[in-house]
Amino acid sequence: MESNNVEEVTDKFGGCLSLDTEKMGKYDRYRQKGKEAALNGELPRALELFQLAYQLQPSEKLKKRIQAIQDLIQREDEEDEEEEEEFVNVNNSGLKLYKGLYDKLYDHQKEGVAFLYSLYRDGRKGGILADDMGLGKTIQVISFLSGMYDAELANHTLLVMPTSLIKNWVREFAKWTPGMRVKEFHGSSKTERNRNLERIQRKGGVIITTYQMLINNYEQLGSNGHREFKWDYVILDEAHKIKTSSTKTAKSAHAIPAKNRVLLTGTPVQNNLREMWALFDFACQGSLLGTSKTFKTEYENPITRAREKDATPGEKALGLRISQNLTDIIKPYFLRRTKADVQQKKLKLEEGFEEEEDQENKCPNAREGVEMPSLTRKNDLIVWTYLSSVQEDIYNKFISLDQIKELLTTTRSPLAELTVLKKLCDHPRLLSQRAVIQLGLERGSDSELVHSDESESAVSQIDNISDHTLIEESGKLQFVVSLMECLREEGHRTLIFSQSRKMLDIMERVLRNRNFRLLRLDGTVTQLAEREKRISLFQTDKRYTIFLLTTQVGGVGITLTGANRVVIFDPSWNPATDAQAVDRAYRIGQTENVIIYRLITCGTVEEKIYRRQVFKDSLIRQTTGDKKNPFRYFSKQELRELFKLEDTRSSSTQQQLQAMHAQSRRSDTSLDHHIARLHSMEMFGISDHDLMFTKEPAADEDDPEDAESHHYIQTRVQKAQELMQAESELHGQLLDSMAQNTEPAWLRQMGQPNSSIRDRPAPPRIKNEPVTVDLTHNSFDEPEFEEDEQNLPSAEDAEMETASEDVEVIGDEDLGDKVISSEVEVVGEEVEVVAEEVEDAGEVEVVSEEVEGVGVEVEDVGVEVEDAGVEVEDAGVEVEDAGVEVEDAGEVEVVSGEGQVQPKSPQSGGEWNLQIVKTEVSPIAEKFADVITLDDTSDEADSSDFNTESKQQNSSQRFQSPSLQFPKLDDLSGASNTLGNEEVEPEKCHSQVLSSPLSQHEATTDEPFKAEMEMPHGNFNLLLEDSADMYFPEDEEVHEVEESAAEESPEFQLQMDVSGERLEEPSINHDKQNNGEFVNYNDSEVSKRESLLKIRSTPNESVDDSFVHSVRTKKRQVISDTEEEEEEEEESEKPCLTSSPFIDAISRLGSSTPKAVLVDGARLRRSLNASVASRRSFVVSLLENESDEESNEDKTKSSGASETCADELVEEVQTSSGDNSKSYETSEANGTLADELVEEEGEYREGKNTSDKVSESNETHSEEFAEEEKPSGDKSESYEISEASETHTDNSEEEIIGDHTGSYKISESSEADESVVEEEEPSGETLNTEESEMGEEEESAELIAGQEQEEWHSAVLESTGDVELDSNETMDQCAPKTVPVETHVLPVSSTNTAAEASDNKYNLLVLSGKQSLAEGRKQEALDFFLKAIDINTGDPEIQLLIIQLYRQLSQ
């Protein structure tokens, strides 16, 4: 009877189980499909599926999700009705702009937005918005981006600007487009920078960075992971920073791939027309103005000559026609409006006149909307001051020196001498202390004279000098003091600009002693917050009457309309520099009339500088269209007389200008009284700078004299335009070809983990004559010389000129059929580099870009690369025509244990993307080198040691059929027993590392590299300098030669094959297609992140030739910043305290650029039709943040529900192990929907990366979970699920990091605390996700202890903004291995309450921390206590311990 009952109960129970299983399966399917539909924007379908799932198994979480979707659908319906009313077509250009934003724009700003859109609409690659300072270029760009993002015509924008403008741009974005995702790539926190960049590249938005950041990190900004990342828009503010194409700034900007480029500058031409050519060459990517040389010959020279006063009529006529032709060419790409233009247009509209020009972008409803405020009057006065008697005496002595006489007879630059003269005109104490003592201005002993620093200014020694003496020694200072007294009486506030900080020191002391309240801003104020504070204080507190600024810092991008008087203490060679300074006060928002005082000393070099300014200004006005034919004031001959001191009590320039313009001055009674008072001060006279070029030249002055001259001019203009057009087309074709067939050098190199060593390898020696490749082209550190020294090509042009590279073979005999033999012996093991024959052999391009922040050249390091066979004269090198031509880089696959490289696909045609094998150069120089060795296996017998031979002969050589093979090691002395058919055990490798003495780091210099290479026509060996940003200083502590030790084992081959299959799947990359254009080069079966075989040369050390092989986990490093390497090393030795409640505040305090709060996603706009400029978008952003916080609290509170969470975790893992669907990006939508949908994002990433490999958690949460997670294969792969923080937001994501042995970690990065784990976690420590916390009670201490050894070998590596690795890829370990210390883990009984689980975990962490502290491991103890304090924040004992540990570690 009992048996029957048992059977009956069993049957019923089995039936229930089967029903429950079927029901749960349907529930899972509905829920999963609902999430997919929601992420694809199919909200009604998602709602239906979620409702079906809710009927099967109701839950509060699902109910919230359904409610959120219903709210979104309702809002979408509401906005559909209002959509037509909310967006306006900007000036009928086709761009729809949010109405609330459109109505706030002035008419000229609407035209600017229409112009920017016309560039995109008409297929132009870029353009220049060159509006005068103060007309709102910032709001025009923000409005344009708002329309482009709303229309989903752009997703990714890179904004580059000077550091001082970042806060202003962030403020404007928050004001005008609160829903747009704007992040900063700036500040001291590399982690935050990386995270922000990765987020913008992945989700879309605007990333703001500075020019210095661009120089240091152009590689990272131009790539995402291993692929080139092409920005939709690259926008440069204050774009005259790239006016010289040979500078690092310009070259770095050229290196950023972009579909469209927009430049913003109020001064497109500052000194000469080549600067304008450089801007257009960048903006239009070389497709508009041809080459620099042609532009100079055909356009710049005729135009410049025509501006001189003594030009012949023919020259004037030619220059005028050429200038008009140039204006017509650039007109579609160039928009410039001055304040005067805007004011005149406004007056014409009021009077009923219509503007004829720019009909395309003209505002059709110009009289509607916001009215442009009237700008106040500006009087720009030149005040001609006297030299003091002391200044005049020193000036005469200096120009009579033999040094000056000799200078005038040579072609040497007189810049240094002119700088001395300029200082003399300002104040004699700006000279060096030594000069001041010699000139008798200050008493000093002979010993002081001998030991005084030549570069030290005498300003630092003015403490004992009276104010009266300081004022009497400078004529300008006498006038300034009198002027400030006058302006204080009249109630005006003043900006004083000087190019010299030391001059500001003198003025600050004198004025403060006269009871002036003043502020100061110069280059010593490095913190942005402090700069903003001072600017805001002056704008709001009228008690401060004077603001002292340096022209370089205070003259760009800031608004200081609180002042209505501006003093330019010393004129600049560049007229635009002074104009920028003036416009800090004279701009939109200024309500009072402005007076400018430019102080110039009579008869000195300053007068010559001013005349030169006027000449440059005429070029600017003519070329930019401000004036077709400006008046000619001076000739070039007059500009050369710089070292002549004329009458210091009068000025011929002032008299000339006064006679021409005195009657035209715009004035009133108060200004007349003020000028009369100025004449009573110590100065010669006044001229009107703002009236320059108001006089028109004679109407027939520039007409050609006869028909023949007219015909010549026409022919010359036509020829110039045709030549420039042909060059532009050729350059465009070359760009297209390079885009298809090449990739940036760092993309090939980034995938290779590298380490550095302390020792410097001996330069390789060769027996035969080496082939020398000239790699001096495209240098980042050395000037590029052409026929004209100022005609410097851009970096982009340099990369294009493949034909200019030449290969020189040095030798006394034909090397056509010979083999250049060389040896590569790496600690006793022979490395063979063999290559398969390539049918279509051609050209190999090898590019090694230098990190700009390092700036060390190969010559500086002292590496004799010439002896290696290749001359490398700088770090930014490019090898072209070197022998093998690769038109379409093929794919490479490791298909055998021998490691041979074979073409992956037949359509690749046997073409190759050559890998670079890295060798290491001395850390004394702290630089690195690439060694590319090619050889032919048929001539291995010819290999021999390198010997130095004299270079005798140069001849060009080419080769056609090189071969390439991955280096392999036949035997590893430290791990030979692991080869063959056995699997490499990481424990053995680590024991090798731990047991190896320091002598193993040292190898002999007597064993150089062995390599072989043969080509039909020549042989070469390249030693290239590599970028230093991909190495870590801490690697110097442990020198490990990493090599794929298991490549001959079946397991190794199996892993490679599996990874290849994964790579072929379309879902392998989690990046969405609409998140930017990714150009994926070399989708190799061998992943680029695969730890490629390294050949380490470690000479100058002991003769221990043993190999050390280990699996190393290393953080990927793409950023190269300006911090010292010592700081990086110190930082790397300290684990990031990610779980500390204080770390977020610390990181924010340490960063000068805190993150923006308001973010919004592209999907939100698609689903809601909400503009990023709308108020609703702003509210949605706030709601998202609130819901995220609530959701985080709920997750923390519900973490005790072990059964529910365990079920969900099992469900998530099942999804991840079986699902290969494409990854998705979460839209930052309203309510809890975004949070809950994003919770599942990690599933897709995990499923995508692992595919058939399912993970086995080292913290088994339940028996079911452990069973379901068994791998599909026979291999045992250990995983560790860790969590960077208990707090999560909607952007948390999972990534998988693997090593050679299949040991992986799954780590989850938290966005909430904005911190990451950069180093290995303390050994034995285990971190859980929320779901896994429930199962912690069921795990046994024995299981944890058994897995500690495996945990030790795979470090917990958190996301630092880099793209996740694929399943077969590895990273090198940064820090030296330490012997793991077992952590005592207390077994805890099974319980269902969250409180008990938290208490158990808390006690466990406290006990582990105290144990570590007792054993002297303070850092590990601190980590444990920080995690404990996150659980129980009120324990005073732990708080005290944390504070004590922080103090001890900081010391």
From Swiss-Prot:
UniProt subcellular location: Chromosome, Centromere; Chromosome, Centromere, Kinetochore; Chromosome
Annotated ranges, domain Helicase C-terminal: 479-639
Signal sequence bounds: none
InterPro entries found in the cross-reference section: Helicase_ATP-bd (IPR014001), Helicase_C-like (IPR001650), Intein_N (IPR006141), P-loop_NTPase (IPR027417), SNF2-like_sf (IPR038718), SNF2/RAD54-like_C (IPR049730), SNF2_N (IPR000330), SNF2_RAD54_helicase_repair (IPR050496)
Span of domain Helicase ATP-binding: 118-286
UniProt-recorded Gene Ontology molecular function terms: ATP binding; ATP hydrolysis activity; DNA binding; DNA translocase activity; helicase activity
Domain of life: Eukaryota
Positions bearing Phosphoserine: 961
Compositionally biased region (Acidic residues): 781-804, 1035-1050, 1121-1132, 1310-1341
TPR repeats: 27-60, 1402-1435
Region (Disordered): 647-669, 778-804, 935-1006, 1035-1054, 1063-1083, 1096-1140, 1182-1343
Annotated Polar residues bias: 944-964, 992-1002, 1213-1230
Similarity remark: Belongs to the SNF2/RAD54 helicase family.
Protein name: DNA excision repair protein ERCC-6-like
Species of provenance: Danio rerio
Highest classification ranks of the organism: Eukaryota, Metazoa, Chordata, Craniata, Vertebrata
Gene: ercc6l
